[in-house]
A protein has these predicted regions:
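Short, conserved beta-strand edge motifs with alternating hydrophobic and charged residues
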Residues: 77-80, 105-109, 137-140
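Conserved, mostly hydrophobic/aromatic
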Residues: 27, 106, 166
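Substrate-binding cleft of secreted/luminal carbohydrate-active enzymes
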Residues: 110-113, 134-218
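Active-site cleft segment of glycoside hydrolase catalytic domains centered on the general acid/base Glu
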Residues: 1-103, 114-126, 131, 145-153, ...
Length: 218
């Protein structure tokens, strides 16, 4: 019953967006679902059982079904708050594949205070592109003067064009002050990135990491 309600709700939202002619390019099922979604039925914790995994994936697939039916051209994205944590990313994605939960884009959150180092992020993203051959989006990060270029350069450097993009959380909060005035310094960084990467001959800033990613255990 819960799965059907999730399916119906997701379908209604997708239909409304389509009718308003604002159909999204990406449909994300849940938010940072490495801890599950729709608690308690879809909750995951460190001691998750097979039943916990099954319950979560059935809920995810209900949303997936609605998205595919209404907006077949849109891409499905699953988001995990595991930016630099390779072992946990692989475990989750392998579970999704095993349980026939679909994803067209690998979505990850990355906050440097929680999700390991920039080098861990880079190594993880390179490993995931090699293993799963899917586009990757860092679809949540806290933009500041120190990390905007770092994170965007890492994603942009992924091989075979698999760096799908980045999304700052929450743009109206980080890019503007309480009076609504734009932060010129942050906008300047994004302007420079646009000019850097709009060129067809732009080269990646980072070289692939020279590590054995099979041994990464975060």
């Amino acid at each position: 019953e819960l799965e059907e309600k999730l399916y119906s709700y997701t379908k209604d939202v997708m239909i409304a967006l389509k009718q308003a002619e604002v159909a999204p390019e990406i449909v994300q099922i849940g938010n940072e679902i490495n801890h599950g979604m729709v608690w308690p039925e879809g909750k995951l914790d460190d001691n998750a059982t097979e039943e916990n995994w099954r319950s979560l994936m059935e809920l995810y697939k209900a949303g997936q079904r609605a998205g595919r039916e209404v907006l077949p051209e849109s891409k499905l994205q699953g988001q995990r708050a595991l930016g630099g944590e390779n072992r946990l990313c692989r475990e989750f994605l392998d579970r999704m594949i095993q349980m026939e939960a679909e994803f067209d884009i690998i979505g990850l959150s990355y906050y440097e205070q929680w999700h390991e180092t920039y080098n861990d992020l880079r190594s993880n993203l390179y490993d995931l592109t090699e293993r799963y051959r899917k586009p990757i989006c860092v679809c949540e990060y806290g933009a500041n003067k120190e990390n905007i270029k770092m994170i965007n350069d890492i994603v942009r450097s992924l091989p075979n064009g698999l760096g799908y993009g980045t999304m700052a959380w929450e743009p109206t909060r980080v890019l503007f002050d309480k009076e609504g005035n734009a932060d010129k310094d942050l906008f300047g960084i994004y302007d420079a990135l646009y000019k850097q990467y709009i060129k067809s001959d732009a080269q990646p800033v980072y070289e692939p990491p020279y590590v054995n990613t099979d041994t990464i255990q975060k």
